[in-house]
A protein has these predicted regions:
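N-terminal signal peptide c-region/cleavage motif recognized by signal peptidases
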Residues: 5-9
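Charge-biased low-complexity segments
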Residues: 10-155
Length: 155
């Protein structure tokens, strides 16, 4: 099981409303109540910790990293438009990396970033419906940002 360090309190986007995909779909950030993972922040933390898997390929180089997952909480609480941003490799085994060419090191870091992005997206897609945000008493779409940290569980 993956040890995950989470910055809980997924943040919403800071704009009155933002057009997504086409002009008929709005995403709001001015709302009365924020979208909530059912069960609250502790339940969200527990869900991610339980479901997030540290990629085996990253273990060979003791790689740790962080990523920001972005997604839309729709009016019905379903999640869409899932993407990964700001993937950073925070730590790796310098002895093992120094044995690789500079080009290979760069390639490996990109591979690990992609693995973290795919795993983060897998976990977000697996989430149950959220309680949607409310604006003037009506459910609205809101863009959320969820940081996830990948830590080698063997450490």
């Amino acid at each position: 099981m993956m040890l995950a360090s989470l910055t809980i309190g997924a943040a919403a986007q800071n704009a009155d409303s933002t057009r997504v995909k086409n002009d008929s779909i709005k995403v709001f950030s001015d709302y009365e109540s924020q979208p909530q993972f059912r069960g609250g922040q502790e339940a969200l933390k527990k869900f991610i910790s339980k479901n997030l898997k540290y990629p085996d390929a990253a273990a060979a180089y003791d790689v740790e990293g962080s990523i920001i997952m972005t997604f839309i909480v729709n009016e019905d609480g379903s999640l869409s438009d899932i993407s990964a941003h700001d993937c950073k490799i925070d730590r790796f085994n310098t002895t093992k990396f120094s044995q690789e060419t500079e080009a290979r090191q760069k390639e490996l870091k990109q591979q690990f970033a992609l693995l973290f992005a795919k795993e983060g997206a897998r976990v977000i897609r697996k989430m149950p419906k959220w309680a949607p945000a409310k604006r003037y008493g009506k459910a609205v779409r809101v863009k959320m940002h969820q940081p996830i940290k990948f830590i080698d569980p063997s450490k």
